[in-house]
């Protein structure tokens, strides 16, 4: 990896200068019955989108470029359900963060700024908080505190858990914090960025808006 640019040639991964390796044990609270995740291994995770009144299902989903991301339904900081596939026609940044991760907190400080800057172009910036600062699954109150601490006023902050991640039996690959997925408006994966680089974030947002 080139530490100056953060570029990695393997499997279209971009890597920022600052990240935290995900080598911590799970906290033991990421049970698949956790209320933060609604039916995590049922139909809600099957790839579904609507064209008019017609449901469309993809036979596979994944995290590699050109694949369709796997759907999720999670609670946001207002206690309302957020479903990824409801936003089929938007370019989406999905930011997987943890409360104990320093680079994640630095990234969170500019979420609302970039969300506002690119909102008119059709960008949706989504934070999925996997763990709190103490390693617990986040509650709605934790999401509200995260949003308040980082001046996030409208961008969704969602309650995740390790059940979402491949290491916990889920579909989303994560080996370091934060990890960002960049998704095009057609709900196609574009690229992944591990670690924090604001310059690279903006460049990749512009790419998915092209």
Which role does the model predict for each range below?
Residues 175-210:
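Thiol-/selenol-based redox modules, centered on thioredoxin-like
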Residues 18-85, 154-156:
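N-terminal "domain-start" segment that seeds a small globular fold
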Residues 89-91, 106-129:
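Conserved helix-turn-beta segment immediately C-terminal to the redox Cys motif
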Residues 90-92, 96-100, 132, 176:
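Short pre-active-site segment immediately N-terminal to redox-active cysteine/selenocysteine motifs
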Residues 126, 141-185:
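Short, internal strand/loop/helix patches
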Residues 96-113, 135:
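Conserved redox-active cysteine motifs that mediate thiol-disulfide chemistry
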Residues 63-67, 85-88, 117-120, 149-152, ...:
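Extracellular/periplasmic catalytic domains that process cell-envelope and extracellular macromolecules
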């Amino acid at each position: 990896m080139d530490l100056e640019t953060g570029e990695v040639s393997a499997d279209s991964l971009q890597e920022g200068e600052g990240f935290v390796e995900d080598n911590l044990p799970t906290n033991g609270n990421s049970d698949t019955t956790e209320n933060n995740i609604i039916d995590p291994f049922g139909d809600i995770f099957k790839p579904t989108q609507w064209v008019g009144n017609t449901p469309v299902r993809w036979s596979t989903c994944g995290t590699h470029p050109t694949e369709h991301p796997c759907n999720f339904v999670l609670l946001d900081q207002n206690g309302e359900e957020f479903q990824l596939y409801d936003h089929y026609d938007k370019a989406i940044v999905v930011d997987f963060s943890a409360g104990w991760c320093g680079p994640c907190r630095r990234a969170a400080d500019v979420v609302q700024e970039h969300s506002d800057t690119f909102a008119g172009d059709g960008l949706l910036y989504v934070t999925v908080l996997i763990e709190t600062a103490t390693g617990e699954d986040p509650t709605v109150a934790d999401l509200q505190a995260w949003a308040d601490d980082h001046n996030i006023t409208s961008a969704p902050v969602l309650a995740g858990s390790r059940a979402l991640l491949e290491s916990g039996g889920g579909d989303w690959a994560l080996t370091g914090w934060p990890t960002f997925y960049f998704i095009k408006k057609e709900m196609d994966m574009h690229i992944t960025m591990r670690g924090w680089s604001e310059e690279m974030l903006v460049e990749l947002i512009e790419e998915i808006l092209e």
